[in-house]
């Protein structure tokens, strides 16, 4: 028999993070999914309070990089306005594109899937369990789909993006659908 022991410590006194570490951000929690040589990558355990669409029109032209959703959550203004991120603002590291927050990729959640735009990411270890891919907006609400970064590649799919379904499988949704947003962010050591 194994014992899972949790020990609470302040984020200010932590020199490093491990996969599975959980932090509280206001009303949300976030779990460490990966550790690099300079940062820990966290994924919110819940969807943001508000559901968002990917784009105002049914198009995936430009991908996530040119989407309305990215422009809403990726910039420093969103983090500055959202009090839930107050505790970590000083430790956030921008991603390569300059964003402080982004949504996860198909690769990070499910591993490589040729049906979707390739992203070069490996599946996060914790995402190998379906229960870690499923989430809700508020405790007790029904599960819903949540956006992923990738465009659908095949057929006449000019308006579809990948999503995590309510049961933890991959699915695709049109860009104007309203869906859950589960931000990813990096914290410096």
Which functions belong to the PLM regions below?
Residues 1-189:
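Collagenous Gly-X-Y triple-helix signature in extracellular proteins
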């Amino acid at each position: 028999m194994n014992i899972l022991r949790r020990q609470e410590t302040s984020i200010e006194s932590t020199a490093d993070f491990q996969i599975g570490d959980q932090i509280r951000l206001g009303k949300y929690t976030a779990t460490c999914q990966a550790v690099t040589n300079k940062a820990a990558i966290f994924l919110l355990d819940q969807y943001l309070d508000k559901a968002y669409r990917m784009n105002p029109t049914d198009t995936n032209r430009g991908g996530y990089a040119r989407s309305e959703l990215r422009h809403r959550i990726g910039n420093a203004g969103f983090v500055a306005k959202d009090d839930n991120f107050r505790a970590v603002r000083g430790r956030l590291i921008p991603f390569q594109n300059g964003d402080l927050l982004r949504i996860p990729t198909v690769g990070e959640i499910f591993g490589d899937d040729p049906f979707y735009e390739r992203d070069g990411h490996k599946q996060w270890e914790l995402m190998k369990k379906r229960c870690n891919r499923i989430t809700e907006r508020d405790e007790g609400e029904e599960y819903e789909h949540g956006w992923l970064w990738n465009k659908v590649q095949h057929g006449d799919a000019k308006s579809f993006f990948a999503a995590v379904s309510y049961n933890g499988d991959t699915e695709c949704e049109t860009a104007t659908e309203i869906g859950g947003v589960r931000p990813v962010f990096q914290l410096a050591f």
